């Protein structure tokens, strides 16, 4: 594996944050400097955490996932007041979801290791599984290449019900068949059998989406020391009750803090991402197997336009009786994370970084400071045949990231012809239409009754010219079919569906191609935190 860094243009909050623009950095409580991390440690030492209760729960949960010894030791270390965490989170995608989930975890592991060495304190890596999520459409699929097309392959559970990812039971038989269909789209390699067994071992131990995700991730990172937490685990919810109560008692201040911070963001020229009603409480409650966002209505806490209604006392009582019924929304999830874990740093993707910039005053309302927010490492893998295609087309490795691949293809094709086809046909159509306009005028003067026919004649001539243009383009493309297929392969591999590779393809493809130790070998590479994109040649 060879690793290179390239500068990929970014926009908005992320670009300005990484470029050190003071205006947007003022929306965060810490700069990404070593002094800021030292200050963060001092700030965390002044706070209290329910460490022992958390350790008890995490030991039980990670042991069930068959965690390695390094993970168990890291969980136990959390009981020490001088231990801190680097944390990130993601939904429980089937087969772990897109590659960026793996890259988030690699980011967490690397930053935790670096900060432990530089700060001289124990720093453990934590990955937060968003188990409360009810949106199965975001986690029930993966993308594959089939018949020279990119296809979204959805897992259709035979027993679907509206429940969270932590509670949605998987039909193992159906899921196994779905996985087999996925692997049929991959090339058969020396690793295929082992990877299928690897995945099936995790599936057999699982009852829910979160189980399957947790087992796969733990198995993939078994020696890394990674700690997993299911955000919707009933035992964790019990520990969170005091903070749920605090959010309910301060929901107006939370909403005001969000509104005020979004006004700051607007004044800086950015468009806020988070959209909420002015009366929202920022807490979900599970009612009749549905996740309902609570709102304030004349002092009552209501859901589904008033279908359900609770007084403050009733809501608090229900939190104490059934904490597993409650979960956070996009605004309060970061707050709950801050309440539960002594967070040295939070690692997020571009979207997360943008919406965290809207939360500074929300954190302050609760009496917290935002942790340092570190953009995750971004990675693209270039396989040997794709590197060959790039070379054959005289493209640089950075070209597909800086330019639209379709545009690169069009430019290459136009360079194979002395005169651009589009330009020549535009010119020809213009000349012919000028002649025909004059001809129509001549016809109209002699026989006005033929005017309509003359107009249709113009339309048919134009149709024939466009047909000729299409046929010529098709023949030119056929002549250069070999080279154009290289562009298609480059597009599919590096910019599938016009998106970054890590947002579409799944890690199982790479495990199948390069072996079960693929992720371990990637983790051995030195990644930098300078905002550049990492390209790994395989």
From Swiss-Prot:
InterPro entries: Bacillithiol_biosynth_BshC, CC_BshC, Rossmann-like_BshC. GO terms for molecular function: ligase activity. It comes from the Bacteria. Transmembrane segments: none annotated. The keyword Cell membrane does not apply. Keywords: Coiled coil, Ligase. The keyword Coiled coil applies. Its EC number is 6.-.-.-. Involved in bacillithiol (BSH) biosynthesis. May catalyze the last step of the pathway, the addition of cysteine to glucosamine malate (GlcN-Mal) to generate BSH. Belongs to the BshC family. This is Putative cysteine ligase BshC. It comes from Bacillus cereus (strain AH820).
